[in-house]
A protein has these predicted regions:
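Active-site-proximal alpha-helix that buttresses catalytic centers in soluble enzyme cores
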Residues: 1-256
Length: 256
């Protein structure tokens, strides 16, 4: 019997956050399972190509990693996705794994971060306990990726779980999902705890703080500049709020 673990992420073109989040997870897995073959894969072709061009790193796709394991004589594979929700990327990964069912004695794909009701409660506790000192009395907005998949509903469920645990004014807005930053701003202005002209804390609800966090969320604000008008920070500023950005992926929180 030869066991292996395949860690799959969408990937990021930001080396620093890759080390703090994805590589950190891989190090933990290798430490926990020293006898297993541990490989990493990047599901995004765009990210793989960028890593090769900019950093001369040959990142494997999930299929390439599974092929490598097959050649190494691996018999049992555990696929560990780092996806937050069970959306399009996670379903593609499951389909890729199914094609290798006959190549190994056993291959199994673990759940995404948010798969069961208890997951939401656990993540809510871990996130709030990690962030509450920075948040203080101010509203907190988490930026999720969002998706056309039905799993987009996970973000609203996560917001509810966070509010229930923290008893605090917390919102989740997405870049590509149904809940936009405009929706959140409207709720903030009409809600009983509306704090127009007040500070608002912005941080990613994503594994890594990469392109979306730096551009779609902060919009250049993290470099001391005025945020881009189309960014979350820019739209909050235009609505009369004072956004403060925490550029940190949730993979940096040990409790998560």
């Amino acid at each position: 019997m030869k066991k292996a673990i395949l860690i799959v992420s969408f990937g990021t073109t930001y080396p620093d956050t890759r080390q703090k989040n994805i590589a950190a997870i891989a190090r933990q897995v290798r430490a926990l399972y020293p006898d297993a073959v541990v490989e990493e894969a990047v599901s995004s072709t765009i990210v793989r190509n960028a890593m090769k061009k900019r950093e001369h790193i040959e990142a494997k796709s999930p299929t390439e990693a599974l092929e490598s394991m097959k050649k190494q004589g691996v018999t049992h594979v555990a696929v560990f996705p780092t996806h937050v929700i069970d959306g399009i990327e996670n379903h593609r990964l499951k389909e890729a794994a199914k094609k290798y069912a006959g190549a190994f004695e056993q291959i199994a794909v673990a759940d995404a971060l948010l798969a069961k009701p208890q997951d939401y409660e656990d993540v809510a506790k871990a996130l709030w306990e990690s962030l509450k000192e920075e948040v203080g009395d101010f509203p907190l907005i988490l930026m999720g990726h969002g998706t056309e998949h039905a799993a987009d509903a996970s973000y609203a469920m996560m917001e509810q779980s966070l509010r229930a645990y923290a008893k605090h004014e917390i919102y989740i807005a997405t870049v590509e999902g149904s809940i936009t930053i405009k929706d959140v701003i409207a709720r903030m202005k009409s809600g009983p705890q509306s704090r127009q002209n007040g500070k608002v804390l912005l941080t990613p609800f994503m594994l890594v703080a990469g392109d979306h966090a730096n551009n779609d969320m902060a919009g250049g604000m993290q470099d001391g500049e005025q945020p881009d008008a189309d960014s979350f920070a820019g739209k909050l500023q235009a609505a009369g709020y004072r956004p403060e950005c925490v550029i940190r992926g949730i993979g940096e929180y040990p409790a998560v």
